[in-house]
Amino acid sequence: MKIKVNDISMHVEIVGEGKPIVLLHGVGLDHTIWLEMAQLYQDQARFVLLDLRGEGQSETGNANHTLEQMAEDVLGVLNQLGLDQVLLGGHSMGGYIALAFAEKHPERLAGLALIATNAGSDSEEKKAQRYADAEAILKHGSHVLAN
């Protein structure tokens, strides 16, 4: 389904019934990373799987989006779905967004799960290394990072 949130239309999949668990994917991914697990446990919880701003089937909107803006997108989805309190889980960049959400809206959380993420944003050095790695892959193929 599509949900209008802030300045964009976001893609949201809901799987199962029960207490809501909202799961946020990492950069370059989409809601489908959670789909198999959600289907497996759909009799135990209501999984709300989003495509974050600029990923999957969601619109990009403002090209300079921030973690805080993306956390507000999550809030908008919760409000549109009438969800007062959720367990929020985030993988990689989704974890950064989940933390930003927790800082601004702790009353909306029944719990927080951070998966393969950090407690803070990447350092400038780490960002530079990530861009250098991406350039190397584009020029020489992914095998350059496997060595």
Regions found by a protein language model. Give the residues of each.
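Conserved alpha/beta-hydrolase "nucleophile elbow" surrounding the catalytic nucleophile
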Residues: 25-27, 86, 90-92
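Residue in the alpha/beta-hydrolase core beta-strand immediately N-terminal to the catalytic nucleophile
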Residues: 51, 87, 110-113
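Short beta-strand immediately N-terminal to the catalytic nucleophile in serine-hydrolase-like folds
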Residues: 70, 88-90, 115
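Conserved HGGG/HGGXW glycine-rich cap/lid loop of the alpha/beta-hydrolase fold
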Residues: 5-63, 67, 77
